């Protein structure tokens, strides 16, 4: 009887880097999806991401999810 090999699952992280656009000035910058600190726009200073203990609440527009 042949031995069956089970497929080994490799765990993938659920967090990603996200390219966000500031709604005020249009600046695009890369933020972390599970940010632990308040993320502000580097140009105008508007808050783009607020930490919630898990995934950050995004106040800017998501342009692209980087993998």
Curated annotation (Swiss-Prot):
Return the similarity comment. Belongs to the eukaryotic ribosomal protein eS27 family.
Q: Which NCBIfam families match?
A: PRK00415.1 (NF001629)
Q: Which GO terms describe its biological process?
A: ribosomal small subunit assembly; translation
Does this entry carry the keyword Ribonucleoprotein? yes
Q: Gene that codes for this?
A: rps27e
Protein name per UniProt: Small ribosomal subunit protein eS27
**Stored PROSITE patterns:** RIBOSOMAL_S27E (PS01168)
Instruction: Give an example GO cellular component term for this record.
Output: cytosolic small ribosomal subunit
Q: Identify the residues that bind Zn(2+).
A: 22, 25, 41, 44
- What's a Gene Ontology MF term here? RNA binding
Task: Indicate the quaternary assembly.
Answer: Part of the 30S ribosomal subunit.
Please spell out the taxonomic lineage of the organism that makes this protein. Archaea, Thermoproteota, Thermoprotei, Thermoproteales, Thermoproteaceae
What keywords does the record list, in alphabetical order? Metal-binding, Ribonucleoprotein, Ribosomal protein, Zinc, Zinc-finger
Residues in the signal sequence: none
Q: Which cofactor does it need?
A: Zn(2+)
> In the record's cofactor note, how is the cofactor described as bound?
Binds 1 zinc ion per subunit.
Q: Where are the zinc-finger regions (C4-type) in this chain?
A: 22-44
InterPro entries reported for this sequence:
Ribosomal_eS27 (IPR000592), Ribosomal_eS27_Zn-bd_dom_sf (IPR023407), Ribosomal_zn-bd (IPR011332)
């Amino acid at each position: 009887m042949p031995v069956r090999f089970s497929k080994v699952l490799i765990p993938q992280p659920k967090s990603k880097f996200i390219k966000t656009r500031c709604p005020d000035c249009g600046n695009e910058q890369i933020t972390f999806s599970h940010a632990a600190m308040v993320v502000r726009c580097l140009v105008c200073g508007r808050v783009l991401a607020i930490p919630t203990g898990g995934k950050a609440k995004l106040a800017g527009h998501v342009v692209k999810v980087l993998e």
